[in-house]
Amino acid sequence: FSDRPQRTSGTNRTQGVFDASGGGSPAPVRKEKKKAHRGLVWVLVLVAGAAIAAGSLLLLHTRQEKQAQLAAAQQAQVQEQQNQYGALMEQGTQLCETDPEQALGCFEQAQALYPEESAPYISYAYALYCAQDYERCISYIEDELGLGKAYDIEAQSQLSEILGAAYFECDDYAAAASFFRLSTAGGDITVNAQRDYAVSLGRLGDIDAADEILLQMYAAGASGDVTDYVQAEIDYAKKEYLDAESGFQAVLNQTQDIALQKRALRSLAEVYRDCAALVRTGSSPIGNPATKAVEVLANGIETYGLRYDSTIWEMLALAYFEAYHTDPSVPQSYLRKAGECFNRVLELGVTKSYLYSNLYTIYYELQEYDLAEQTLDAYAAQYPKDYEPYAFRAMLYITLENRKEQSARDYSAAVEAYETAGQLLRSDDDATYYQQLQSLIQQLQKEGWING
């Protein structure tokens, strides 16, 4: 018997190391590790996938947020542009009555913001009309806008109405009536357009059509002062001068519409002008119409601030001239005032040949021959191809020589001017003045003052 530990237990310990269940092979332990590794990989994959998904969602959200911000910015920009456009149109519309030149700038800016919109172009045309630049208004609508054919019927009608009004102010009543008629295609036209349409028809001699428009105005409820004005215009067209005179005077005394007062003033002056032409034949129904025209026009220039209205100044010049020659009661200064008014017309930039001839006639009659010759110098410089200034000059020189002693007379300058006038005379010219001069030259030839 021994006290050492027994060795038989070693085998059991070895088995326990390799197989807890009592088996001897190590392979089942490696399989479990692979399973655990695969599980860990799947967890990592799932985590990575979740991270990628979260990143994608974040990126999508950021992109959507940026798109929303961009859309909001674009919307704000569009809104700002619309607000700016609306403000420009409103400001321009208000300025049309007070400062149409500035209104043109507003409408140009509005056109730049929305070039496809018709409204700023129509408003620009209206501003030209308000600025009294009628020729420019007409060319803008007809040439630059092509009568608005690219726009809808309503826009075309508005442009036709403006065009009709511009032609009316240019005294082209046929064109005015034509475009006013076209403006009705877009529906009812404004009272102002009806007014000018009726007046245009009356001045064209179409009294029945003018009366029809007036009836439409009554039916539409047009104000009494406007219909009274149109009725007076129709009376004037019918040459019922007394009725026309009282009608225009009533409008001047009753209406508060300054624009209508100016129209009535001008038309009343035209009544007096036409009657002044009848005074010389003794057939004027109105006494001393030229003198009345002077009073109406001179007062109108002061009352309505018409110092820059060349047509009013021209009418006043003619009224002074006619009153001087037909009404013995007027001051002698009327003839000189006529000259001053014609000079005022020239100062305002109007260049018409008859203005120079009228002014020359006045200075000649006043025996202010130096001023008469200066007027002829300006006439010839402005119209170098016209024969009239040379014909007048020859007559003037003949007058000046006739005032001298016979021994001091020299008609050579008159003959030279006469020959120049003959060289410039064209077949389509009114040869009246040349024929008068020719008679004077022939008389001088007969008397031996000049060679035949």
Question: Where do the model's predicted regions map?
Answer:
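Start-of-helix register in tetratricopeptide repeats
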Residues: 86, 119, 154-158, 192, ...
